[in-house]
Regions:
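Active-site neighborhoods and metal-handling regions in enzymes and metal-associated proteins
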Residues: 2-169
Length: 169
């Protein structure tokens, strides 16, 4: 089912920007807590407390379609939407933390990949390539740009580096 794109007014854009900025603040804050020995459940608790109490926002994933936590933590080979729990991070792991906050009716949604200690060579290549894909995608965003064209640039670059994109989850 295709949904029509709804144009936003200046107030909507301002509130969207704020939601995005709050999401970035959570990602910046949690990075200092990503280290060997911490559990993904502990990272979830830290983020939940920060989102609710410091930012006065709502963690969107919590109870969404039965999702039991406030963030998603995808460790190593988990592609996306990993559920935080008792798993302890260890040196060499990589963890993607996906944050979505709701503030004043708008969602801010972003994720960031963090190395735990010193990442293995392939993990570092993955993180570097993902960042380069992000930068390439952003570089072609402009009025009139088509989502398919942006995705194609990202896919082609990822595949040229020996990686693939997620088609379904």
């Amino acid at each position: 089912i295709l949904m029509a794109i709804q144009l936003k007014n200046d107030d909507d854009l301002s509130r969207m920007r704020i939601a995005g900025q709050l999401t970035r603040q959570v990602l910046d804050m949690i990075g200092t807590h990503v280290k060997p020995g911490v559990t993904t459940g502990e990272l979830d608790e830290i983020c939940h407390d920060y989102i609710v109490n410091s930012l006065q926002a709502v963690p969107a994933p919590l109870n969404y379609r039965g999702f039991p936590k406030s963030i998603c933590t995808s460790v190593n080979h988990v592609v996306c939407h990993g559920i935080p729990g008792d798993k302890r991070l260890k040196n060499g792991d990589i963890v993607n933390i996906d944050i979505t906050v709701i503030k004043d009716g708008f969602h801010g949604d972003a994720s960031r990949m963090y190395p735990v200690g010193k990442p293995q060579i392939m993990a570092q290549r993955l993180m570097d390539t993902a960042k380069e894909c992000l930068e390439l995608g952003i570089s072609v965003v402009r009025p009139g740009a088509r989502l398919g064209d942006i995705g194609s640039i990202i896919q082609n670059y990822a595949e040229s580096k020996g990686f693939s994109i997620v088609r379904e989850y």
